[in-house]
Every structure is written in structure tokens, then in C-alpha cells.
Amino acid sequence: MTIYNFSAGPAVLPKPVLEKAQAEMLDYRSSGMSVLEMSHRSKEFDAIIKDAEYLLRELMAIPDHYRVLFLQGGASTQFSMIPLNLAKGKKAYYHVAGSWGKKAYTEAVKLSKTIPFEPILLASSEEETFSYVPTFDKDVIDPDAAYVHLTTNNTIEGTALYDIPDTNGVPIVADMSSNILAVRYKVNDFGMIYAGAQKNIGPAGVTVVIIRNDLLNSEPALSSMLDYKIQADAQSLYNTPPAYSIYIAKMVFEWVKSLGGLDQMEVKNREKSGLLYSFIEQSSFYQSPVKNPKDRSVANIPFTTPSKDLDEKFVKEAEAAGFKNIKGHRSVGGMRASLYNAFPVEGVIALIDFMRVFENQNSQ
């Protein structure tokens, strides 16, 4: 039985990458060592981390005046790191279109009790269960603010922000954890981008930060480990980095490049998601909780049946049929198909076939 992994993260990785990692597990390029055990100061690992940065710069067209960092702590640590480094004595705006954006804002509010800055809720769609991406008037933003924080893809709710809003000249800080390398964004539109690896980059353990030089803090942050300038000056080697996760990330970047790069990856992702959205649209049995088609994520597609009982039955039968981790997040319910870069189109077609049979067997 073929297994299709719909996990929202950690997520499916490219098979060629896993096979290469397997082949190099005990002896990386005749070094006599596994990447798991080699020094992060060795010439072998120095080449790995430099190649990873070079490839990511090439794929995303990252300008020279941005630094690329490979950090630890997941994207959630960035919720604290961002205000600690960027927001002292200033306003910081938060665009909240999903659960992760809310967590970023909540953490900022918590930090504002101990460091001097003012987190402001710019817009939120929480009152309608984050079923759409809210808009805002740029004129309400203080041009002297530190940043506007937004999330480009809402993993749980299945919405995404493709058109970057006007923020009245204030730098945008973007959480791209679940659609980095999936769709094209212009790096120049952002002051900072960050992403946890475990969706489209590699295994959990490394967090990518892309930050404009002028945003590197001039004053020390609360902790050296949480200081962007210290991390940048140390070239992500202030302490022992998540070496193996960076190694896998480098191979994922190579894989994306081999398939034609980011633009070709976006074409493939829109094809995959389009197949599933089209099927849901023509069905009277399945529903999408996302209100506006323009807000639909290409990476995470939630859907429901007519009842919670049928949702539970669907998940149980789908799991037995090889469709793993398709249960929706507990805050949304239903099902969620996460179609990250490494997820094959064949899996989408197989899921649609299963959905069609389930609908025929369970329609009133």
C-alpha cells in the first residue's frame, strides 16, 4: 500500500534527498564521518552551510544587503526575538489572520510588560474563526513604527496572503514558515523573513532568518543567543548550529533547483492544490472553510463533510487506506491536506479518488 503523508509539519521530504542522506549517513564524501558527528568548525561543514546559503540566495533572489541566518528554536522563538531586537521604544503592528499570527501578537504583548515597546493589533479575522485574510488602511500605521508583522500562510486555517500590502513605509516582518519556497515573493518587499524548516525546507531543528542589514540591532539584545547582530557576525556559528538539519536543508535546496527553481515549484503547487480545490467546489458533500477563493492556501487545504461524525469516519477510513495525518487541526476540525513541495501530485489524485468513493457511499 502506498502511503501519502499529509502532515502539516514535520512534513514529507523529497525521496531523493532522503536516499542521498541514507547513502551518506555513515561516511560523508569520504570524510570517514557522518554529518551527525562532524565538527561544525570543520571544512566539510563550512562548505555545507555556505552552500546552503548560496543556494537559498539563488532560489529566492535574496539581495546582497540581506543576511541569511540558520538559527535554532523554531519560528516560535522568533516571536520573542523580533521585538527584542527591533522594537525597543517603538510601535509594532501585528496583522493577525490565523492562529500563528495570534501567537506572535500574544507573545509581543507579554514582552511589552518587560521591555519598552507598544504592540498594536492592526487587523484580525479571529471573530470569524480566521476564515479570511483581513485588510487594513495603511494610513493608520505610524510611519515611525518598528515593523508590521504578518504571516504569509496560515497553516491551520488554510489561508494565505499573496499580495503584500502597503504598510506606509514601515518594514514588513513575515512568518513564511509554511509557504517559503512554495510561491514566489520578492524579498525586497520585506525587512525580514523567517521560517521554521519543517514544512518546505527540511526536518525540524533549524529556522531560516533573512534580515535586511539596516535592521540588525545596534544595541545588544537581552541575550546573545537572541541577538540578530551577534548571530550574523558569527555567520550562524555563535554556538553549535543544528548541523544535520542544515545539511538536509542544503539538499532540499538542491532538489528545488533541479526541478526548475522556485517559479517552477509554484507552478507545480498551484496545479496540485487546484485539483483538490476544483473537486471540493463541484461537490455538494465537501466544504472549504475559507470564505474567499483569493485567500486560499496552495500549501494547506482544510475541508469538511456534512457532519462531525462523517469527518471522524473519513479520517479513520482514510488512515486505513494510507492517507496519513489528514485529520484537521483541533481548532478547525474536519480534514486538512498539506501539499508541501515534496508532496506528489499522484497523492492528490489518489485522495480525490478516495473522496469521491466516500461521498458516494455516505451521501444521504
Curated annotation (Swiss-Prot):
Q: Identify one Gene Ontology CC term for this UniProt entry.
A: cytoplasm
Entry-annotated residues carrying N6-(pyridoxal phosphate)lysine: K199
EC annotation from Swiss-Prot or TrEMBL: 2.6.1.52
Which terms in the Gene Ontology molecular function aspect does this entry carry?
Answer: O-phospho-L-serine:2-oxoglutarate aminotransferase activity; pyridoxal phosphate binding
Gene3D superfamilies, sorted: Aspartate Aminotransferase, domain 1, Type I PLP-dependent aspartate aminotransferase-like (Major domain)
- What InterPro entries would the database entry show? Aminotrans_V_dom, Aminotrans_V_PyrdxlP_BS, Pser_aminoTfrase, PyrdxlP-dep_Trfase, PyrdxlP-dep_Trfase_major, PyrdxlP-dep_Trfase_small
Give the catalytic activity. O-phospho-L-serine + 2-oxoglutarate = 3-phosphooxypyruvate + L-glutamate; 4-(phosphooxy)-L-threonine + 2-oxoglutarate = (R)-3-hydroxy-2-oxo-4-phosphooxybutanoate + L-glutamate
Q: In which pathway does it act?
A: Amino-acid biosynthesis; L-serine biosynthesis; L-serine from 3-phospho-D-glycerate: step 2/3
Q: Which UniProt keywords apply?
A: Amino-acid biosynthesis, Aminotransferase, Cytoplasm, Pyridoxal phosphate, Serine biosynthesis, Transferase
**One GO BP annotation of this record:** L-serine biosynthetic process
| Note on how the cofactor is bound | Binds 1 pyridoxal phosphate per subunit.
Q: Does the keyword Membrane apply?
A: no
Which positions bind L-glutamate?
Answer: R41
Q: Where in the cell is it found?
A: Cytoplasm
| Binding, pyridoxal 5'-phosphate | A75, S76, W100, T155, D175, Q198, N239, T240
- What are its cofactors? pyridoxal 5'-phosphate
Q: Which SUPFAM superfamilies match?
A: PLP-dependent transferases (SSF53383)
Q: What does this protein do?
A: Catalyzes the reversible conversion of 3-phosphohydroxypyruvate to phosphoserine and of 3-hydroxy-2-oxo-4-phosphonooxybutanoate to phosphohydroxythreonine.
In the record, the note on similarity to other proteins reads: Belongs to the class-V pyridoxal-phosphate-dependent aminotransferase family. SerC subfamily.
Question: How does this polypeptide assemble, per the annotation?
Answer: Homodimer.
Its recorded name reads Phosphoserine aminotransferase
Name of the gene encoding the protein in the UniProt record: serC
